[in-house]
């Protein structure tokens, strides 16, 4: 197979795709991009009008985005029902876990943009606080769910692990690891080869 993906080394959504691909036994060529919410990479825009990563090029000429679509495509390509349960309560629970993790990441990314993109004199503290509250309440819910994660490797646990890794990268000062059950689970999951191979670079 010759799949290619536009990526950014610090994107948690790209990492989710890379982890899913590795767990399913797929390799893909990584195409560097300068994806940015303000100055968009026009090379990416020509194939994904949102100008966002990840954007996947499949063997048969399709262009897929975003991470949720790409991960489900990869699972189907691998025969299905490995990362995404086919039906029933289990499917909806895994999709809800993915949704919570992705929503927490959306809030964390908005916090990051407020810090590094918005001019300092325009910094809006109530906005930043509101996003942090979303992250905090999400972590509380994940802590409650963590005893049920066990050794599962699916779209729910992959999404959650990638979200926690991003908090480590950009917001270590927020101390998410005080959620002890969640932190213990993450230590085990983050040791997986798929997580190690896709690890974010250390911040400059």
Locate predicted features.
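Short, hydrophobic secondary-structure boundary micro-motifs
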Residues: 81-86, 177, 196-201
């Amino acid at each position: 197979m010759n799949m290619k993906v536009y990526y950014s080394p610090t994107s948690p959504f790209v990492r989710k795709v890379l982890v899913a691909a590795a767990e399913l036994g797929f390799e893909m060529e990584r195409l560097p991009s300068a994806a940015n919410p303000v100055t968009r990479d026009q090379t990416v825009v020509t194939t994904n009008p949102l100008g966002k990563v990840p954007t996947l090029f499949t063997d048969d000429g399709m262009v897929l985005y975003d991470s949720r679509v790409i991960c489900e495509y990869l699972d189907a390509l691998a025969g299905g029902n490995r990362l995404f349960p086919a039906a029933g309560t289990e499917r909806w629970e895994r999709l809800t876990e993915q949704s919570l993790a992705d929503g927490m990441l959306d809030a964390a990314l908005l916090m990051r943009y407020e810090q590094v993109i918005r001019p300092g004199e325009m910094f809006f503290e109530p906005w930043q606080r509101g996003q942090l509250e979303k992250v905090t309440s999400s972590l509380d819910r994940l802590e409650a769910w963590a005893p049920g994660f066990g050794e599962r490797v699916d779209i729910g646990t992959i999404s959650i692990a990638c979200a926690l890794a991003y908090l480590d990268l950009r917001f270590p000062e927020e101390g998410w690891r005080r959620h002890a059950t969640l932190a213990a689970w993450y230590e085990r999951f983050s040791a997986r080869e798929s997580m190690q191979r896709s690890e974010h670079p250390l911040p400059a």
